[in-house]
Amino acid sequence: TCDGFFFRDQDIAVIGGGDSAMEEATFLTRFARSVTLVHRRDEFRASKIMLDRARNNDKIRFLTNHTVVAVDGDTTVTGLRVRDTNTGAETTL
């Protein structure tokens, strides 16, 4: 089941650094305004071809060295709080 059309013209996030994360981030750019790919390290486990596809997509922004600390919202997601693993600073997407 694909829920991508529910996110049409929205800014969304994908968490992870493997092939599945790269594939979903790339696929979701068909619907979303932008996709932020959040990964806890600065290196990825994804295969080179999957990583290159994601890196060559202008709609995908990479946020490395960050972890998710909270999902904001009651009945729907309104934001995603992430923490920089180097500085400890928190940001809301």
Predicted regions and their residues:
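Glycine-rich dinucleotide-binding loop and its adjacent helix/turn
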Residues: 1-31
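A Rossmann-like FAD-binding core segment of flavoenzymes
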Residues: 30-93
